[in-house]
């Protein structure tokens, strides 16, 4: 069993395509702990999708196919030039592995700070109400 997976941003752009012969959980965990991609990529992910394949070879071929189809900005250019001289039926559906950000919501680095400010203001208002 193997998987081809993709990272999708909040604008529904495919920003990275990869494959793994491991479980999806293990591979995604590796991305977020020992990630080889720029931090900007990981911060841009809204959703992770995957397709399950019968063999690692199938997953590798489909990785190259999808990189050439989507031209993700965080894939290395060496795989984007690979050409497949075979007919591929692109009929399998992507399944959602994990939703990280909801679509159509703008996430900013300051969101964490704003959240704490709002929590602080709410706590202050509650304390002021009871005093």
Where are these regions (language model features)?
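Structure-specific nucleic-acid interaction/processing domains
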Residues: 2-15, 21-105
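C-terminal single-pass membrane-anchor helix
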Residues: 102-131
């Amino acid at each position: 069993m193997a998987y081809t997976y993709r990272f999708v941003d909040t604008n529904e752009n495919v920003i990275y395509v990869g494959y793994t012969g491991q479980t999806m959980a293990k591979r995604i965990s590796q991305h977020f702990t020992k990630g080889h991609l720029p931090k900007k990529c990981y911060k841009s992910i809204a959703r992770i999708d995957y397709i399950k394949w019968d063999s690692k070879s199938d997953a590798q071929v489909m990785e190259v196919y999808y990189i050439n189809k989507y031209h993700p900005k965080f894939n290395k250019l060496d795989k984007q030039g690979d050409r497949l001289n075979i007919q591929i039926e692109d009929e399998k559906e992507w399944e959602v592995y994990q939703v990280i950000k909801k679509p159509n919501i703008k996430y900013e680095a300051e969101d964490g700070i704003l959240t704490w400010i709002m929590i602080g203001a709410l706590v202050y208002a509650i304390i002021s109400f009871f005093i």
